[in-house]
Amino acid sequence: MTILRDYKLSGRKAFAVLLDPDKVEQDAFSTLLQRTADYPVDFFLVGGSLVTDYAHKEVIATIRRYSSTPVILFPGNPLHIESSADAILLLSLISGRNADFLIGQHVIAAPLLKKSGLEILPTGYMVVDSGTQTTVSYISGTMPLPHDKPDVAACTALAGEMLGLQLMYLDAGSGARRPVSAAMIAAVRKAVNVPIIVGGGITSGEKAYEALKAGADMIVVGNGVEQDPDLLPQLATVVREFNQSVVQA
């Protein structure tokens, strides 16, 4: 989606909400979508590392009823392809060494993606240690990047960019005890020119601002925005004010 690159080139930042179909509670979900009229988000991501309900189509249909915001799939496996979305993050788990998540799943998904009409976003997916084991680390059988090793993350991202990946996604994971560090985001920002997405552990406006200032082009928050009524306006306001400061500068 060229809009992410446009955001980066302009210096503007994006805000995305990640919706896990397994964790969507319908009443809270509808309320969240209505609130985005006052506190806009730039993208909805739909998916998760382990989705058992496969309600992607229903979740996307509900989003469409309330919003024209673009929907991007965040797939855990080839079964999570849904053509009613706008685009899909084609995730290559470059922080790990499991060939199935580097290329194996992609071989299975490729013909389905070809037919889907979705915009394909080749993404270097880097799982970062957040103080607790995440679902993606367990399912993939891989170790996350050490929280305090920004140089390792930078070299990993650089290799991904050299391989042709068009986005980098630093993810501390659902339920993270701590977010990706500003030092790691800054190191990756210095190493690569592609847009950087950062998610996991962003539980306050202050943490969102730190990620944006360090070099994140898009921040992602999960279903926690449904549970904490104050989080959506906090994050939307931080991103809006950050972008306003860029324009004024």
Curated annotation (Swiss-Prot):
EC number assigned by the record: 2.5.1.41
Binding site for sn-glycerol 1-phosphate: 169-175, 200-201, 222-223
A single GO cellular-component term on record: cytoplasm
Record: residues binding Mg(2+): 20, 49
Tree of life domain: Bacteria
Pfam families, per the entry: PcrB (PF01884)
One GO BP: glycerophospholipid biosynthetic process
Assigned keywords, A-Z: Lipid biosynthesis, Lipid metabolism, Magnesium, Metal-binding, Phospholipid biosynthesis, Phospholipid metabolism, Transferase
EC top class named in words: transferase
Reaction equation(s) it catalyzes: sn-glycerol 1-phosphate + (2E,6E,10E)-geranylgeranyl diphosphate = sn-3-O-(geranylgeranyl)glycerol 1-phosphate + diphosphate
Keyword flag Aminoacyl-tRNA synthetase: no
GO MF: magnesium ion binding; phosphoglycerol geranylgeranyltransferase activity
UniProt cofactor(s): Mg(2+)
Record's function text: Prenyltransferase that catalyzes the transfer of the geranylgeranyl moiety of geranylgeranyl diphosphate (GGPP) to the C3 hydroxyl of sn-glycerol-1-phosphate (G1P).
UniProt subunit comment: Homohexamer.
Family of the protein in this entry: Belongs to the GGGP/HepGP synthase family. Group II subfamily.
Protein name: Geranylgeranylglyceryl phosphate synthase
Organism: Spirosoma linguale (strain ATCC 33905 / DSM 74 / LMG 10896 / Claus 1)
